[in-house]
Amino acid sequence: MPDIPPGSTALVPFLGYGAEGADAWVRMHRSDRRRLAMEAARDKDVAVLLSLTEAWLRTYSKAGATIAKGTIENHPHGVRKLLAAWAEEDLLKPHAEAATRYVRMMERQGLKSGTIYGRIAAARALYRALRWARASAYDPFADVHVPHDPTPPWEKRRPYNNDEIAALLDSAADPFDRVLVLLGAHGGLRAGECVCLHWRDVNMARRDLTIRASKGGKTRTVGMSASVKQALQGLPRRPDGYVLPYRTPKTAWAHVTALCEKAGVAPKGMHSLRHSAGTRLYAETGDLEETARHLVHTKLDTTRIYAKWNDRKLRETLSRW
């Protein structure tokens, strides 16, 4: 596809999102790209800045074209939060302390470290995009550090225990909700992976699932429990080919929360179903490597959290003291 000639107005005022939007930014003459980026930063044009940021992520981030869908979906929220907080700030020449003040403001609001980190990551992506467009040479978040959360990882998001999982399944009158719970609690799938699961990636003969929308853009194969297989076999096929009707992770979370309320279970979020899978697998196998393989952890330290949650032996020992 040829480059877009200098001075073209075909892409003004908005370039759009996705791979086509990214390609439009890349093909644009550098003088036009710089002009559009500078105007968008000056006017705090959210749509154009989000389009520019996504174009940089899809083109120049480490993941490139395989960048995770979750990253693409989460960054706009962080960019919008920055623009709202910096309503009076010059984006092209921000104050030397503006980034640090932004972090301190989020701390005072009581936001968790993970939330702050996500917003800073989005802000850094925005400024990398602006530097790529030669709209600004500033890198205000280069030396900004996210405060360390002293809470141990195993205390942050505890898993649903076996009784709670059973209660959720008993309350799932909708077969799609039942499959959703089992994909998380047995398969260890994340919310985004559940909603992107397609029937072509379900192999009943081999009893496995191919997960293509995985974190970090990795494709992985997950073993299918007998319960998951049985639930899938009784599921009606949808015209679009997707296993579940929920199209966004947020919708999947909402269904799990509603199930928790119906079952009288304290809601811990969708991701805690994945933690349940890891905790149960480690409890029944005692094998960290097998647990890590099922959840596709690249570091065993991540999997060790499940050993912390499975404190049955510790409790039994203490009970004899």
Name these PLM-found stretches.
Residues 54-70, 76-155, 235:
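N-terminal core-binding DNA-recognition domain of tyrosine recombinases/integrases
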Residues 187, 196-231, 301:
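Conserved tyrosine-mediated DNA breakage-rejoining catalytic core shared by Y-recombinases
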Residues 136-138, 150-167, 216-226, 238-243:
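DNA breakage-rejoining catalytic core of tyrosine-based enzymes
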Residues 182, 186, 276-298, 305, ...:
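C-terminal catalytic core of tyrosine-transesterase DNA break-rejoin enzymes
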Residues 148, 152-153, 162-191, 195:
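Basic, Lys/Arg- and aromatic-enriched nucleic-acid-binding interface segment
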Residues 225-266:
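Active-site/catalytic core of tyrosine-dependent DNA strand-transfer enzymes
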Residues 249, 266-285:
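Short basic/aromatic active-site micro-motif
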Residues 213-216, 295-320:
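Catalytic-site neighborhood detector that most strongly recognizes the C-terminal catalytic loop/helix
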